[in-house]
C-alpha cells in the first residue's frame, strides 16, 4: 500500500532537468563531481559467504555497516545515520487526497512531531493513513560475469540509474513516495494503515486492490520498484545478504493453528515506540525498517508493476499498475536458465538486471548466498508475493 507524492515547483524543476544539466550543476570547473555521492556494493557471485561476498564501493568504502545490537536492544546505524536516504525518511499522516498532513514523532507514533500533541496514527475516524515517506534517490543495478552491483546516488549519475520508485503513472519523477507504516487492515471495505489493528487476510490481488483504491485514486499497492528500492538500501547499509540477521527475524515462526489468535499474525503498532529501525532475533516478533512494519515475516505482501507471465518476468516502469502485465516490458525468461514448472529452494545464482535481481538456481541455504527461499510456478500469470509469513518468513 503506497502512493507517489508531489513536490513543490522548485524541486520538480530540478528533478526534471536533463542529466547534463544536473551533472553540470554538480561539477567543479575542472569537471569533477562536487556534491554527487554514490553508495554501492559489489557481490561476488562465486563466494557463498553471506557477508564475505559483499564489498563496499565508491563513497561507501570505509563505512561501518548498520545492524541491530540484540544484546543491548538498540539499532546501530554504523556510519549511515546521516546519509541522505536515512535522514529523508520519516513517519507521517497522509490524507485520502494524497496530501501530507503532518509528521509523526519518530520515536513514538502516538504523538505528532512536536512530541506533545496526540496523533491520529490509531484513529479509525481519521481521513487518511499512517505512512513512511521516502524522498529522493536514484538506483543502479547491473552485473558482470563475476559480480553483481547495487548502487545508490543522490543524482542520476549516468544513464544506468533510474528513479522508478518515485515515478508517477504519467511518467513524471516526483520528489519521493509513501509506503504504509502498517500492514493494511480492512475497515468499512477500505484498506487502512493504522496502529492497533489486525491485518486483513484471505484476499486475492483484485480484492486487495479494490480495498486500497477505496482510499482514493492516488492510492495503490506498493510497487515492485518501491519494494526493490528499500531492499537495495537495506543491503547497502548492512553490507550483507542476510537482512534478517542484520535487522531482525520478523515474525517468521509465530504461527499458531488458532483462528482466535489470527494464526499468529500480529496486530499493527507493536513497534510504534521503537524508532526508524528495530528488530529481534526471536522468530515471533515484529520487524521495522525505514519506519515501516513487517517488511518481512508476519504476512505475505502482494506488490504491483511486476508480473510473472508463465515464466516470463515483466515490469512496468510506470503506469496503471494493472495485474495482468498488459503493456509491461520483458526483463527475464526463466526458460532461458532451464527453469520451468513449479520449483522452489534457497536462492543461489541470481541475475542482476536494471529492474532488479532474480534467482535462477535454488541450491543455496539459510546461511549462504542470499539466505532466502524462493518459489516459482511458470504455469500461471501472477504478481509477486514477497516477505514471507509467520510460518515461513
Question: Could you tell me what each predicted segment is?
Answer:
Residues 1-30:
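Short, low-complexity N-terminal tether/leader segments at secretion or assembly junctions of large
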Residues 6, 17, 136-139, 181, ...:
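Hydrophobic side chains in beta-strands
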Residues 12-13, 49-50, 186, 392-393:
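Short, surface-exposed beta-strand/loop "edge" segments at domain boundaries and coil↔beta transitions
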Residues 23, 27-188, 215-225, 230, ...:
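Extended N-terminal export/anchoring regions of large proteins
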Residues 39-45, 226-228, 252-263, 271-272, ...:
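C-terminal, surface-exposed recognition/capping segments
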Residues 119-121, 125-128, 157-295:
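Short aromatic-cysteine micro-motif
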Residues 309-320:
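A short, polar/charged loop-to-alpha-helix boundary motif
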